A protein has these predicted regions:
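Hydrophobic h-region of N-terminal signal peptides that target proteins for export
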Residues: 9-17
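Sec-dependent signal peptide recognition
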Residues: 2-9
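Carbohydrate-interacting regions of secretory-pathway proteins
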Residues: 18-391
Length: 391
């Protein structure tokens, strides 16, 4: 693991993070990185434009028209990023844009163009919708956008200055993207905080949850609520929500309590499971173990991987420390972040059905379950929150 990947934890006491990292406070507040500073993981290029990572930024040269879009789709959120371009450059940010079609038509474009001949839609405006206050980005320097979109409400800041507040409700959810429009432009520090998450654990008792044990369990799991946490020991078994969810953003803090250097508690978060049925649905793995001292070699799919299907690309978390897991699932697509670092970006390619282990894609609603894997299970969960996503 590079120092950049360790930085979010190393900067626990810092007020500001280095480029393309998060502070510990940002991690705890639910921010995630869309750009890891090293690769285009989690992004897809559309059109003939060419994108590359150079000097800690995503850059495009004058190589053709197109856009680079996020794998996951978001509804309500705060987006922060920095960009650098010549003063006469023409680009934009696409928000809530559909997978297919023109992104500024299916969603919205926040303009990056000081010299637009149409005075209504210069930098910071929602193109074809809302005019921003007069504002210019600084050519050749890093500029900061902060965009908040929540329901139909929009707010845009450029370099800390409020330049747009509006009500616009054409599109409710979609990809986040960056435009290539024939000019060189760079982007970095791209991070998102999902909004609208509500607790699914009251911090006091297991109201709203249901225990599901297996008859073969020699040591049934012991679930308890204490000090704002769900604690579990022993197993196998599971604790599932009574409510059901299909497309959603899920966040929680997890601690795997290892009992020694060779003990790495095995658990998981099951998604879209069948109520009262043991270990069904997609499993977002919890296992902070890796091979040969290399965090890019996860054991048993690794924390943040999709069990049976997609290993995590890096084991970011450590045992005996709380880490924050963020899951964004919409339709067939699953994005997972650990401590705000993107580790899984996966699309289920299988035909639709109900039995995931039979290589069927389950798209309907189901319960969220916490797994007690075996008699050595020992974990804590806290700050469990969910936001349902619009269709």
């Amino acid at each position: 693991m590079t120092m950049r990947w360790l930085m979010p934890l190393a900067l626990a006491g810092a007020l500001f993070a280095q480029p393309n990292t998060l502070t510990r406070q940002e991690v705890d507040d639910g921010w995630v990185l869309l750009f890891d500073g090293e690769s285009l993981f989690g992004w897809t290029g559309i059109g003939p434009s060419k994108w590359e990572v150079k000097d800690g930024a995503i850059a495009t040269e004058p190589s053709g028209m197109g856009w680079l879009r996020s794998g996951s789709q978001f509804a309500d959120y705060i987006l922060k990023l920095e960009f650098r371009a010549a003063e006469n450059a023409n680009s934009g940010l696409f928000l809530r844009s559909a997978t297919a079609g023109e992104p500024h038509v299916t969603g919205y474009e926040v303009q990056i163009w000081n010299e637009n001949p149409n005075p209504k839609f210069k930098t910071g405006s929602l193109v074809n919708h809302v005019t921003a206050k007069p504002a210019k980005f600084k050519g050749g320097q890093w500029n900061a956008f902060e965009i908040r979109v929540e329901g139909d409400r929009w707010a845009v800041k450029l370099n800390g200055k409020n330049i747009l507040q509006a009500t616009e409700g054409k599109s409710k959810i979609g990809h986040i993207g960056m435009q290539s429009n024939g000019h060189k432009i760079e982007f970095r520090n791209i991070k998102v905080k999902p909004l609208g998450l509500a607790p699914i654990f009251n911090g006091k008792d297991l109201s709203g949850w249901r225990k599901v044990d297996t008859p073969r369990a020699k040591e049934p799991p012991v679930w308890s609520a204490k000090d704002g946490m769900i604690h579990v020991e022993k197993g196998p078994g599971q604790l599932e929500t009574k409510a059901q969810f299909d497309d959603a953003v899920i966040q929680m803090a997890i601690r795997a309590n290892a009992q020694g250097p060779t003990h790495h508690p095995n658990s998981g978060v099951f998604l879209r499971g069948n109520a009262n049925q043991f270990w069904t649905g997609y499993e977002s793995q919890i296992r902070n173990e890796y091979k040969d001292g290399d965090r890019t070699k996860p054991v048993d799919f690794g924390t943040g991987g999709i069990y049976h299907f997609q290993p995590t690309r890096k084991v970011v978390a450590n045992d005996n420390e709380f880490f924050v897991k963020t899951i964004v699932m919409r339709g067939r697509h699953f994005g997972v972040w650990i401590n705000g670092i993107p580790v899984t970006d996966w699309e289920d390619p299988h035909p639709e059905g109900e039995v995931i282990r039979n290589k069927q894609a389950k798209l309907g609603a189901g319960v969220i379950s916490l797994q007690a894997h075996d008699p050595t299970t020992n974990l804590d969960f806290k700050n469990l929150r969910v936001a349902k996503l619009p269709k």
